[in-house]
From Swiss-Prot:
Keyword presence, Acetylation: no
GO molecular function, one term: double-stranded DNA binding
Record lineage: Bacteria, Pseudomonadati, Pseudomonadota, Gammaproteobacteria, Pseudomonadales
Record-given protein name: Nucleoid-associated protein PputW619_4243
Cellular localization per UniProt: Cytoplasm, Nucleoid
InterPro entries for this protein: Nucleoid_associated_NdpA
Xref: HAMAP family: NdpA
Keywords: Cytoplasm
Family that this chain belongs to: Belongs to the YejK family.
Gene Ontology cellular-component annotations: bacterial nucleoid; cytoplasm
Cited Pfam families: NA37
Highest taxon above the source species: Bacteria
Natural source organism: Pseudomonas putida (strain W619)
Amino acid sequence: MPIRHCIVHLIDKKPDGSPAVLHARDTELGASDAIENLLADLNDSYNAKQGKAWGFFHGESGAYPLSGWLKQYLEQEKDFAAFSRVAVEHLQKLMEESNLSTGGHILFAHYQQGMTDYLAIALLHHSEGVAVNAELDVTPSRHLDLGQLHLAARINLSEWKNNQNSKQYISFIKGKNGKKVSDYFRDFIGCQEGVDGPGETRTLLKAFSDFVESEDLPEEAAREKTQTLVDYATTQTKLGEPVTLEELSSLIDEDRPKAFYDHIRNKDYGLSPEIPADKRTLNQFRRFTGRAEGLSISFEAHLLGDKVEYDEVAGTLIIKGLPTQLVDQLKRRKD
């Protein structure tokens, strides 16, 4: 993962309305193993975060100036340190206007992954811990806590440059439960939501369920294809990459690589060719399975509490909306 430029600034602020004090670094960080490890760990932590949103820049204006400064940097009108300096000064101003905001170290990193250029911006905090030194004494130790990553964004610079119609070249961490704590950071990035990741993922899973039903697949084949979808989508989220419908279709059915893709297009589900899969929604699609004494049961996890009710005390399942094929067999048996 080549790192083109990287710099860290510090904004000292407590969430009590006190002024935000900026401690800006003048020069970029030099290349080192520590920087590479930091970026790798940051990417892993960011990709694993649930509840991210995707979007695109507001039009450049005084309220949303970051995209203009970023364009100046990419066109070599500003160097990276100068770009990060005006950006962090703007963030400092927004922090002062938000009483709930807390300061920290602000990381700006321009790096390349494959053939794609990204800009990562993250607010990092320290955690207190302990370490054992060379004299075998236990001493206090501070470290960057990437497990508590709450404010961060990643801009796909290549997508922004090459696809003017894209509405998902920015991803950012949303506040939990609709909290407004992170609004100032989204305004700093100047991002408006363009793609509903959870909604798109639910639509994809609905399309897949409809496809499996229309194909009238045996239970084992349906289970294998479901696992293929979940594994592929989960891998893409870990990599920070979108789910590509054509690639997914070819994985689901190697003999008919366009079958699922054509099903989506013919039924007009309204899905984009690439969608940012939502990890939380994917986890709800995993299957529960079990066999015992001639009985085989398998259902998708998201049906629990809806079409499938579990009574733990009685040890029973109540299934609503039985498959038509099963109902017909039961009726014939009764007759």
